[in-house]
């Protein structure tokens, strides 16, 4: 029996990854791992991560990292205001991404995931692979979502853990619209995913994540079931 831990934020990428691991890679035993790092969207992220775990008959595990919010200057911090971005802002997603980037976040997440899988192995003698929903974003936007980063973290696993635990990013070479198409084929309920940095009941529609979510559905030619307070009307700039 194959065992997997999937890092999940309740977003399209990680929820699709969880479905892919369960349904296509045939991992029978699944753990959905969620991190509470004080993000402003904690409520919606946790809600949809839990729903994902329930749908896939997976165990839900939460790790607290609230100190990360205290040291971060990112807009995930509830104390900072999120401004509406224009269509022209989407021309330079690298600049916009900097505002939401949490330094070393994915490295911190994966080190904790490694500690979890090694602890499980010591106690239960069950070996777990670790899956992440990284997509093709480029080193300039998010340096901790690249193939090079995944390779280096795997190198770290080999020298820091007693067993060779693998970290796998199956969607890392494809874009958001491709992930949406894949998710549709796998039966992902996109209404039960979240992207918004604000984290209210309805997606704001104007933060970078909401803009890219709308753009992804548009180019995937898949109906977007999301309710937005502000909806994009023109995608011709992309």
Please give the residue ranges for each predicted region.
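A polyampholytic, Gly/Pro-enriched intrinsically disordered region
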Residues: 186-190, 214-219
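Charge-dense, low-complexity polyampholytic segments
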Residues: 125, 130, 197-203, 222-230
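ATP-dependent adenylation/nucleotidyltransferase module used to activate substrates
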Residues: 1-187
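Local cysteine-cluster metal-coordination motifs and their immediate loop/turn environment
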Residues: 111, 192-215
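Short, structured secondary-structure boundary patches
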Residues: 79-87, 208-217
């Amino acid at each position: 029996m194959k065992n997997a831990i999937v890092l999940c934020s309740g977003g399209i990428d990680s929820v699709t990854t969880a479905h892919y691991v369960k349904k296509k890679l045939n991992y029978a035993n699944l753990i959905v791992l969620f991190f509470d790092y004080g993000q402003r969207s904690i409520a919606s992220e946790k809600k949809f991560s839990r729903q994902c775990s329930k749908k896939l008959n997976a165990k839900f595990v939460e790790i607290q990292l609230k100190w990360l919010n205290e040291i971060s200057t990112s807009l995930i911090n509830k104390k900072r205001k999120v401004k509406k971005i224009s269509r022209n802002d989407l021309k330079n997603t690298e600049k916009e991404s900097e505002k939401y980037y949490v330094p070393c976040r994915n490295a911190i997440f994966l080190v904790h995931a490694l500690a979890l899988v090694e602890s499980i192995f010591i106690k239960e003698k069950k070996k777990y692979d670790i899956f992440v929903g990284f997509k093709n974003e480029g080193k300039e936007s998010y340096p901790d979502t690249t193939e090079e980063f995944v390779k280096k973290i795997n190198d770290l696993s080999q020298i820091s853990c007693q067993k060779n635990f693998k970290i796998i990013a199956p969607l890392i070479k494809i874009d958001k619209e491709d992930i949406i198409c894949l998710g549709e084929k796998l039966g992902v309920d996109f209404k039960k995913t979240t992207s918004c940095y604000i984290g209210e009941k309805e997606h704001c529609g104007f933060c970078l994540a909401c803009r890219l979510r709308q753009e992804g559905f548009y180019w995937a030619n898949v109906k977007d079931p999301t309710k937005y307070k502000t909806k994009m009307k023109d995608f011709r700039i992309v």
